[in-house]
Amino acid sequence: MPNPSNRKGKHSAPGQVNVYAKSNEVIVKITGADTDGTFEVVEENCKPGFQSRAHYHIKAFETFYVFEGSADFQVGDELFHAGRGSCVHIPPGVPHQVTSKEGVRMLMIYSPAGTDGMFAAMHALTQEQLMDAELTRRIALLHDTVMIEQSKDGRGKGTILG
């Protein structure tokens, strides 16, 4: 049953949301707390050369919408090139990895919610801790995310954030 305290709309104006900028700028627009855990909305601005660590989500569906730039999405055995206006949807349990040579600005929707806390936890780490694959793997697992392996060229060594 919905929480009566969440019976209000929410406007996420620039600068009035949770912004995490360790490697990429991650902007949590709508949190799981805002939706009683139903979904969350996150904007991510990835720098040129971005490559996430391969991972999957245990319960969450993840949908990406590309606003600017482009990215390659390895989703299971399929590779999608997504440019401006593209949408990529990934069901729970499907391994995926995102790379972008030129940089990309995208919106991510997770349902159910659960990953927004991971961005805050990763942001609180030192640079040395971010490179600790075991530590970041444990943090990710607490937030519905299973890290699979290091990225092929050594990038994305610690976090889902690249």
Please provide the spans of the model-predicted regions:
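Glycine- and acidic-residue-biased ligand/ion/polar-headgroup-sensing regions
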Residues: K59-A71, G76
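A hydrophobic, small-residue-rich beta->alpha segment in the mid-to-C-terminal subdomain
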Residues: R105, F119-E128
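Short acidic-glycine-tyrosine-enriched beta hairpin
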Residues: G9-A13, V17, D77-P95
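A short, N-terminal "cap"/entry segment at the start of jelly-roll beta-barrel domains
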Residues: M1-F39, A124, Q129-G162
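Ligand-binding loop in jelly-roll beta-barrel domains
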Residues: T35, D72, P92-G117
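A short, compositionally biased micro-patch
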Residues: K47-G49, K59, V66, P91, ...
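Conserved short histidine dyad/triad with adjacent acidic residue
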Residues: I27-K29, V42-H57
